[in-house]
Amino acid sequence: MIKNTGHRKLGKTGSHRRAMLNNMATSIILHEQVETTVAKAKEVRRVVDNLVTLAKNGQNLQVKDTLKDKVAYKKLFEVLASRYEKRPGGFTRIYRAGKRPGDNAEVAIIKLVD
């Protein structure tokens, strides 16, 4: 009897959800912040924290599966891995930014910690 899947479905199929989270993670690595809904921010935080940890440990093949953009891949390994070398975890922070005017969805800004 399966009780919990351990992640939010976000109203999407598995492949669509995985692609969306990978694209959002790439955007966060490139721009260091993204504005999205709170639920998506909480899910993409897991992906980004895992990517930074893998980059710190030098596991580049697993990171290549997620990041398809060469610029983001290079920035992750050259800039972010050295920036967070001494930090054990918690590489992102989520700030709530109110409600979106169009559909009244709760919006959050997810940033990389300095």
UniProtKB/Swiss-Prot annotation:
Keywords: Ribonucleoprotein, Ribosomal protein
Gene name as annotated: rplQ
BP-aspect Gene Ontology terms: translation
Protein name as catalogued: Large ribosomal subunit protein bL17
One cellular component term from this protein's GO annotations in UniProt: large ribosomal subunit
Subunit note: Part of the 50S ribosomal subunit. Contacts protein L32.
GO molecular function annotation: structural constituent of ribosome
InterPro entries in the record: Ribosomal_bL17, Ribosomal_bL17_sf
Top-level taxonomic group: Bacteria
Disulphide linkage map: none
Organism of derivation: Elusimicrobium minutum (strain Pei191)
A Pfam short name: Ribosomal_L17
Family: Belongs to the bacterial ribosomal protein bL17 family.
